Swiss-Prot record:
Quaternary structure (record): Heterodimer; efficient DNA binding requires dimerization with another bHLH protein, such as TCF3/E12. Interacts with MEOX2.
This protein's GO CC annotations: nucleus; RNA polymerase II transcription regulator complex
Official protein name in the record: Transcription factor 15
Principal localisation: nucleus
Amino acid sequence: MAFALLRPVGAHVLYSDVRLLSEDEENRSESDASDQSFGCCEGLETTRRGPGPGGGRRASSGAGPVVVVRQRQAANARERDRTQSVNTAFTALRTLIPTEPVDRKLSKIETLRLASSYIAHLANVLMLGDAADDGQPCFRAAGGGKSAVPAADGRQPRSICTFCLSNQRKGGSRRDLGGSCLKVRGVAPLRGPRR
């Protein structure tokens, strides 16, 4: 006698009255899939496994097609809200990052990379203080300028950022641009007491 190993066919294809599986149920491992009953051989399933934990067929929640549709619609609405929230946050972040040209539309990955670089740049500006009057603290601190500027407290500045590198490639300085990146958004640099 020959036996064939058959994989379960989706319930929604064979039986329209069986509820659709949620994402969690669809993502279960194949061993868990063997525990599911798709409407055929229900009596055989319970006698073979017997009652008890993990045995027998799963109790149906009594969810009809209308309930499943409502649950799916609610999940879709939550996902739309989440996506809208993420997009709003990216829009807010884009307004804080100086770009050239000013109206340049950044992708999400460009926004994250530029934000990271801008944070590093601002950290170097804070670390170096007044020592970087040319508007390129990261470039000078990395040794790319005429003299490397050490941090006031001996810490090493971070590597050159996109903003200082762009400024250096243009051959410009702080005075040529009419102010540092801090002044692009109307933020004045912090000036602490000189040591």
